[in-house]
From Swiss-Prot:
Described function: One of the primary rRNA binding proteins, it binds directly to 16S rRNA central domain where it helps coordinate assembly of the platform of the 30S subunit.
Pfam family, one: Ribosomal_S8
Record protein name field: Small ribosomal subunit protein uS8
HAMAP family in alphabetical order: Ribosomal_uS8_A
Amino acid sequence: MVMLDILSNALIQIKNAEVMGKRQVTIWPVNKLTYYTLRVLQRYGYVGEIEYVDDGRGGKYIVQLLGKINDIGPIRPRYPVKYREIVQWEQKFLPARQIGILVISTSQGVVSHIEAKEKKIGGVLLAYVY
């Protein structure tokens, strides 16, 4: 099986585990972008503890699920977004105001759309979660 997008694969694994009611999920393969995205989800209370396990083949993450995710997914293609346009993308991907987050890769790291608006920076849309 050819893995084209590691981040998309990780988000789909989380979504499937949430639907099945599991308490933890093992994400493999991983990269730094996946880790930073998981950290944003952890900061906003969508996932619990994130543990890295070095298995000699690139490693994997064991993520504790809290049952708070209704929907999660990658945004493909990865649209570039200016900070003034973030509200329009919120309306497109999130169900209502103040519900859920967009994950954005910026020049200052991977952040949520809330942090990007506060810092007045744009970036590339990676994922949505609510």
